[in-house]
């Protein structure tokens, strides 16, 4: 909790988060988050369902909206893997997995990113736009903590992580900082990082 009174969020059956200061959370009968609904309309480009659309969406998801019916929609496969996210602006992000449950593809806005794994550690990622855009990730031995990023054009970056293994900074070959993020004590970004 972020307040002394512990009133900044509420939990429901199964200890599921049902609301916080920004969202109402809706779940399906299997406990999967299916909709994260804005409490207020502060997000630019939000698509708000009107009348019949809102009722149809409530029926389809098996939920009852508590505010405007605008927010993030999550669709799940029968095996519990996230298959699709529909953003508040209506744009869709879709995912595909291999037989071991590892994400092998993410598609958004006409770009598809592919992932290759070494056991449970991501090894390569690339987009379909060009062959020379392969990215190789190196991890600390026997951990999930990223240590470096190698790009096909010859760029390489060292990654500095915090004590939990969360990447906090990245440096190029010359030792110049090229990326940084800062988190508050709840893990939210204080300073939004640039793309890395």
Predicted regions: what they are:
Residues 33-38, 45-47, 60-96:
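Surface-exposed extracellular loop regions of Gram-negative outer-membrane beta-barrel proteins
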Residues 8-9, 25, 74, 95, ...:
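A residue-level detector for well-ordered beta-strand positions
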Residues 1-16, 20, 116-123, 128:
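Structured, non-catalytic alpha/beta "coupling" segments that mediate domain-domain communication
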Residues 2-12, 153-196:
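A motif-centric feature for acidic-aromatic and gly/ser/thr-rich catalytic loops and repeats
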Residues 1, 16, 30-32, 81, ...:
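Conserved Rossmann-like nucleotide-cofactor binding loop
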């Amino acid at each position: 909790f972020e307040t002394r009174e512990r009133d900044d969020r509420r939990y429901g059956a199964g200890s599921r988060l049902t609301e916080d200061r920004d969202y109402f959370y809706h779940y399906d009968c299997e406990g999967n988050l299916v909709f994260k609904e804005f409490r207020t309309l502060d997000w630019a480009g939000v698509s708000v369902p009107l009348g019949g659309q809102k009722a149809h969406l409530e029926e389809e998801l098996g939920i009852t909206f508590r505010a405007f019916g605008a927010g993030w929609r999550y669709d799940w496969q029968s095996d519990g893997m996230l298959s699709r996210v529909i953003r508040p602006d209506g744009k869709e992000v879709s995912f595909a997995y291999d037989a071991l449950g590892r994400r092998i593809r993410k598609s958004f806005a006409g770009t598809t990113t592919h992932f290759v794994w070494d056991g449970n550690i991501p090894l390569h990622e690339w987009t379909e736009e060009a062959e020379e855009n392969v990215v190789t990730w190196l991890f600390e031995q026997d951990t999930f903590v990223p240590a470096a990023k190698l790009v096909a054009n010859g760029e390489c970056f060292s990654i500095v992580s915090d004590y939990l293994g969360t990447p906090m900074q990245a440096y190029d070959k010359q030792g110049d900082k090229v990326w940084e993020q800062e988190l508050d004590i709840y893990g939210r970004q204080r300073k939004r990082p640039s793309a890395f």
